[in-house]
Amino acid sequence: MTNLRKTHPLMKIVNSSFIDLPAPSNISSWWNFGSLLGICLIIQILTGLFLAMHYTSDTXTAFSSVTHICRDVNYGWLIRYLHANGASMFFICLFLHVGRGLYYGSYMYLETWNIGVLLLFAVMATAFMGYVLPWGQMSFWGATVITNLLSAIPYIGSDLVEWIWGGFSVDKATLTRFFAFHFILPFIIAALAGVHLLFLHETGSNNPSGLPSDADKIPFHPYYTIKDILGVLLLILALTSLVLFSPDLLGDPDNYTPANPLNTPPHIKPEWYFLFAYAILRSIPNKLGGVLALALSILILAVVPFLHTSKQRSMMFRPFSQCLFWILVADLLTLTWIGGQPVEHPFIIIGQLASILYFLLILVIMPITSLFENNLLKW
């Protein structure tokens, strides 16, 4: 008798995705982050659902409803901090997942890569709107500053901003719609992740060498299920340690002050995972230029496959490209640091240099270096 998991209409989808999936035998722990992102999404949806049961999206009561969750709801503080710090873990996994894709040439799977870029945008939008919901000082002013950037769009800018606000400033209408979008987007992200997996399973996984691995495949279960479980346990260990020992480590103290439109905080800055993009935005003195640079800092990922000039897919055997990759990582860490600093000397010039280097590395230096490495192979 044929196994039920191979014949049942639903079970065979699960079987071909997570059990009998042929996987390369040499994929390293850098390939764990896909499953970790899935776990992060599940954690965020579950904790978010329980938070939504107690949260009110009204300017008069939003802040106090979050306080009520932390003080009066059973384990409300735990749910709230799991959700807030779960977002940080989500972004850590995202950045490592994207970095892995860049290093090992996974971007050569165009459909999978482009849906991944779309997913990154969707998660960033969700996180931004979620940050507005507690209605603290940084929530309000962050929303004001970021939505205001759209006014830089010629002709329709100011109308667009008022349309998004639902009035003439960030107010009740804005908060209500942000809550609605923040609730629906994770489900859209889950659907997109399904499509992301669908396209990945059309081609099969890449591997560290970047060479075809059809001749050497192993079943996903038990090898990679066990490996993924180890990753999940480490993720949960990191998240619970953060939540139980220093839940406010990555937050902003200003967000414990209720939103006040009449009092601007001295330093408006987003959560740590947006700081690199915020630094790029601030490094250009022109408003429209800054907005374009901000959008391009993420959109540039969609261009990466077309800038691949190397004869080899992975960077495993390309030491010069490896050096440039780690310079890019250091540059992004520098931008993250600059994004959290005040706009004054020497931070302004450091931010501008780091922003220029970011775009130069991806658009010019890395493709030229790849061509140089191709010529090295001839010698």
Curated annotation (Swiss-Prot):
Belongs to the cytochrome b family. It is found in: Mitochondrion inner membrane. One of its GO terms (molecular function) is ubiquinol-cytochrome-c reductase activity. Heme b b562 binds at residues 83, 182. Component of the ubiquinol-cytochrome c reductase complex (complex III or cytochrome b-c1 complex) that is part of the mitochondrial respiratory chain. The b-c1 complex mediates electron transfer from ubiquinol to cytochrome c. Contributes to the generation of a proton gradient across the mitochondrial membrane that is then used for ATP synthesis. Keywords: Electron transport, Heme, Iron, Membrane, Metal-binding, Mitochondrion, Mitochondrion inner membrane, Respiratory chain, Transmembrane, Transmembrane helix, Transport, Ubiquinone. The keyword Cell inner membrane does not apply. Its main location: mitochondrion. Heme 1 (or BL or b562) is low-potential and absorbs at about 562 nm, and heme 2 (or BH or b566) is high-potential and absorbs at about 566 nm. GO terms for cellular component: mitochondrial inner membrane; respiratory chain complex III. A ubiquinone binds at residue 201. Coiled coil: none annotated. The gene is MT-CYB. Gene3D superfamilies: Cytochrome Bc1 Complex, Chain C. GO terms for biological process: mitochondrial electron transport, ubiquinol to cytochrome c. It comes from Sorex raddei. This is Cytochrome b. The cytochrome bc1 complex contains 11 subunits: 3 respiratory subunits (MT-CYB, CYC1 and UQCRFS1), 2 core proteins (UQCRC1 and UQCRC2) and 6 low-molecular weight proteins (UQCRH/QCR6, UQCRB/QCR7, UQCRQ/QCR8, UQCR10/QCR9, UQCR11/QCR10 and a cleavage product of UQCRFS1). This cytochrome bc1 complex then forms a dimer. The chain crosses the membrane at residues 33-53, 77-98, 113-133, 178-198, 226-246, 288-308, 320-340, 347-367. Heme b b566 binds at residues 97, 196. It comes from the Eukaryota.
